[in-house]
Amino acid sequence: MARHVLVVVAVLLFATAEASQCSINGLPLVRNISELPQENYGRSGLSHTTIAGSVLHGMKEIEVWLQTFAPGSRTPIHRHSCEEIFVVLKGQGILYLTPSSHSKYPGNPQEFHIFPNSTFHIPVNDVHQVWNTGEHEDLQVLVVISRPPVKVFMYDDWSMPHTAAKLKFPYYWDEECYQTTSWKDEL
């Protein structure tokens, strides 16, 4: 009996190691979003889940996130060299956006109100920020990005020169699992 218990424990430990946060081995094809791990990565007011991604799941063309922002919280002012699509699931907020241009800094952003069932896209390298303006309700969004893993350039404010923006790579949710091995195209 004790021998069987040891075998079962060994199998469970091996399976747990195989299905670690940084491995696609052992992950089921169909998963329940509410059972996926959520983290704030040291950013107060944020809850982030990578539903399907480059670093965690081996995706090459797109990455999908579920993000929840507490009332008053926001993303940093930032840009990245990928396209981004948002679907607002609940809550309300403001999208601040400056189109990429040949100016030396982002400048004054345009404001767009976002609300449940609204969707918007961020073109490549457009500086933007999403802000939860709701007083009592979380802002929850489903986000799809192209060309993962994301390389983010962060700004202190809208007048900071593009050349002074700080690169954050790997991004917070990719830090633990990112490996410096090069990604190879299928060709």
From Swiss-Prot:
Glycan-modified residues: N117
Biological process terms in GO annotation: auxin-activated signaling pathway; cytokinesis by cell plate formation; positive regulation of cell division; positive regulation of cell size; positive regulation of DNA endoreduplication; unidimensional cell growth
SUPFAM superfamilies: RmlC-like cupins (SSF51182)
Binding positions for Zn(2+) per the UniProt entry: H78, H80, E84, H128
InterPro entries, alphabetized: Auxin-bd, RmlC-like_jellyroll, RmlC_Cupin_sf
Signal sequence residues: 1-20
GO molecular function, one term: zinc ion binding
Top-level taxonomic group: Eukaryota
Cellular compartments annotated: Endoplasmic reticulum lumen
Pfam families xrefs: Auxin_BP (PF02041)
Span of the annotated motif Prevents secretion from ER: 184-187
GO annotations of cellular component type: endoplasmic reticulum lumen
Keywords, sorted A to Z: Auxin signaling pathway, Disulfide bond, Endoplasmic reticulum, Glycoprotein, Metal-binding, Receptor, Signal, Zinc
SS bonds (residue pairs): C22-C177
Function of the molecule: This is probably a receptor for the plant hormone auxin.
PANTHER family: AUXIN-BINDING PROTEIN 1
Assembly notes: Homodimer.
Protein name, per record: Auxin-binding protein T85
